[in-house]
């Protein structure tokens, strides 16, 4: 475990009966970073968080939190828990206690803090989450967003080194969820606590993180910065899961440096960047982000093909086109609505171009 890490998972395995939930998971979380663990339901992300806080016990491998290896030693586990805040999707507020009393419960009972000091800290946290005027109200008198702010304040009040957040915004509506994403991000930036944030929402992951760990099938598929993850996915699952993606199935028929030629299942040929499929004869799924393809490109691109517009959908800042291209009837283009004078309508044939460097030859699906 490096000196700048607060969490280290090494070859961690976890089973529920015969179901192998975590499979040789390796993950290092740096001090004061904001890392998002993102993946579909059942991928193992929440189980990993529960193992870190010892709500579940792993069977194999090593988990170290703040220099302490988590084993069956209850003394060690309790000392770690005193430094870890938790926020869940369910707010878990005590309905018979006021907001301030909910927040002071942990410092008074866990850290044996004097009541007056705990109440002062509670008010400081309520200022941070911008609801100090709600201190004497009860949870039932608050909106969902206000209750979640109380849950966040409660997790921070005893100055933890680490906060674990397991889908904390899942119960909120879209607008409130987006607002709270920025609030949590700004709180982290202002106080510098380490945050491990679990979500299945790809947009939330891109918004909230310094780094993203994409989980699937009990494994970390890729751990990267948001831009690296989006622009340079290492396999087909990551490319599909993070952001929108156009795909073609095919076989590599030639390779020269950072360019390969792929014969698609439709019989057409395109040029791509050999990332996973690097040898002649390898099957591949080719990945291309919608915004990387252009209509009637003004510059030379090494892929140029004709497609037919099947559907036009207005999205405010851009128009979304569904195109029949090279055997893919679900090929998506995004055209900025500042592109004036472009004749876009269903049934029209268009020229579409993109560069091979933006088109990644990944593992076959």
Which ranges hold each PLM region?
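ABC-type ATPase nucleotide-binding domains, specifically the catalytic core motifs of the NBD
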Residues: 73-74, 97, 104-117, 128-129
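Conserved ABC transporter NBD signature motif
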Residues: 61-72
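ABC ATPase NBD coupling module
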Residues: 70-85, 115-116, 229-233
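ABC ATPase nucleotide-binding domains
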Residues: 78, 103-105, 120-122, 127-237
């Amino acid at each position: 475990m490096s000196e700048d890490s607060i969490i280290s998972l090494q070859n961690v395995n976890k089973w529920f009966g015969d179901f192998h939930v975590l499979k040789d998971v390796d993950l290092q979380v740096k001090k004061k970073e904001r890392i998002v663990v993102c993946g579909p339901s059942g991928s193992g992300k929440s189980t990993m968080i529960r193992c870190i806080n010892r709500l579940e016990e792993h069977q194999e491998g090593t988990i170290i939190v703040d220099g302490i290896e988590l084993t069956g030693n209850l003394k060690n586990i309790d000392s770690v828990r005193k430094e870890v805040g938790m926020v869940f999707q369910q707010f878990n507020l005590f309905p018979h206690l006021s907001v301030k009393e909910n927040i002071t419960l942990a410092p008074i009972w866990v850290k044996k803090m004097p009541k007056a000091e705990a109440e002062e800290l509670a008010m400081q946290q309520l200022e941070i989450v911008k609801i100090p005027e709600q201190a004497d109200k009860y949870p039932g008198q608050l909106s969902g967003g206000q209750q979640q702010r109380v849950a966040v304040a409660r997790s921070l009040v005893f100055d933890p080194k680490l906060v674990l957040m397991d889908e904390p915004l899942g119960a909120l509506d879209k607008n409130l969820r987006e607002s709270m994403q920025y609030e949590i991000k700004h709180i982290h930036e202002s106080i510098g606590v380490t945050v491990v944030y679990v979500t299945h929402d790809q947009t939330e992951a891109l918004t909230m993180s310094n780094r993203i760990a994409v989980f699937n099938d009990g494994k970390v598929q890729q751990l990267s910065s948001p831009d690296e993850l989006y622009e340079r996915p290492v396999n087909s699952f990551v490319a599909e899961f993070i952001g929108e993606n156009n795909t073609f199935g095919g076989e590599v028929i030639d390779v020269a440096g950072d360019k390969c030629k792929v014969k698609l299942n439709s019989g057409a040929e395109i040029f791509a960047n050999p990332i996973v499929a690097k040898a002649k004869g390898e099957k591949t799924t080719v990945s291309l982000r919608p915004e990387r393809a252009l209509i009637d490109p003004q510059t030379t691109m090494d892929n140029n093909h004709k497609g037919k517009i099947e559907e036009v959908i207005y999205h405010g800042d851009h128009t979304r086109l569904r195109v029949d291209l090279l055997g893919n009837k679900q090929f998506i283009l995004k055209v900025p609505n500042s592109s004036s004078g472009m004749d876009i309508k269903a049934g029209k044939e268009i020229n579409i171009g993109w560069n091979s460097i933006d088109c990644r030859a990944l593992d076959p699906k």
